[in-house]
Amino acid sequence: MNVLLSPQPPVFPHQHENHHLSPQRSLSPFHNMATRKRKADEDGDETMSPRSSPTISSRPLARPSKKIRANEVIGRPLALPRLLETLDTAQLRTVLERICERHPDIGHEVETGAPRPSVSSVVVVLQGYMEKLSNAVPYGETSPEYTYYRVKEPLVALIDALSDFTPQFLPPNETQPTKSLEFLNEATNIIHKLPDWEPQTYRHHKENAYEEISKAWALVINEAGKRAGGINLHSGGWDQILSRHNEQSGGRLAYAISAMTTSVGWLDPSTSSGPAGASDPNSILNQLMSGIMGLA
């Protein structure tokens, strides 16, 4: 059989394959699955990213602290030297006392390192107590009982201060008799100014103060009498000063008078000349030293 076929142009499959097939049909099932999986992974990564996380996005980011410039104005507490400048004596003493109470070793350093108190500085303190006592006295006519209980607290404070300060100026703590005698002179003058209560029961404060200061005088006089036979006591006019104090106290300085008589060997009865009496040419010691009594 002879069959004649009409010639036809050759057909290349790759030229018409994409033209006739839709995109959905051209993708294999495996390709679709891979596409969906990749998209899901991308969605998951986007969900876990810091930008999409609500927890991380709401957390404030830590910023570096701003460095304060040297010339920038900002509040700050005072330095210790400036703070101490603002404290008065009472405030500074209170702060120091509290520190020493909490730290006994610091208290010991203060005791050993502080300068020795002078007679004038202690007298100023005692005068402060005396001023408080004077301010506590009520105005007008009042009963002795009312007046006593009004001034009792500052009176006791003054007596206690005298008792505490006096041993500081007594031997052997104080080795200079002149300084001891200067303090006792000032302390005795303060005791003279204490009120004389009409009822005897209220006078025990002043009576006890006289007795204690008289014993202090006696101690200093006995120590001073060991030096140069007590000549310095008389040449400084202390025998006459003590005589005046004894007269003003109503004879309550018996211990001191006895010690002065023993140390010096005499006691000038003149009490009006005070310290200047030492230069009196008629004083007993000056007469002895000048030989007047020997020539008489």
UniProtKB/Swiss-Prot annotation:
Matches recorded under Pfam families: Cut8
Cellular compartments per GO CC: cytoplasm; nuclear membrane
An annotated GO BP: nuclear protein quality control by the ubiquitin-proteasome system
Region entry Disordered, spans: 1-64
Alphabetical keyword list: Cytoplasm, Nucleus, Protein transport, Transport
Low complexity compositional bias, start-end: 49-60
Classification via InterPro entries: Cut8/Sts1_fam (IPR013868), Cut8/Sts1_sf (IPR038422)
Location in or out of the cell: Cytoplasm; Nucleus
Keyword Cytoplasm among UniProt keywords: yes
Single GO MF descriptor: proteasome binding
Keyword Nuclease part of the UniProt annotation: no
Residue pairs linked by disulfide bridges in the UniProt entry: none
Annotated TM spans: none
Record function comment: Involved in ubiquitin-mediated protein degradation. Regulatory factor in the ubiquitin/proteasome pathway that controls the turnover of proteasome substrates. Targets proteasomes to the nucleus and facilitates the degradation of nuclear proteins.
Subunit and interaction comment: Binds the proteasome.
Protein family per UniProt: Belongs to the cut8/STS1 family.
Protein name: Tethering factor for nuclear proteasome STS1
Species this chain originates from: Fusarium vanettenii (strain ATCC MYA-4622 / CBS 123669 / FGSC 9596 / NRRL 45880 / 77-13-4)
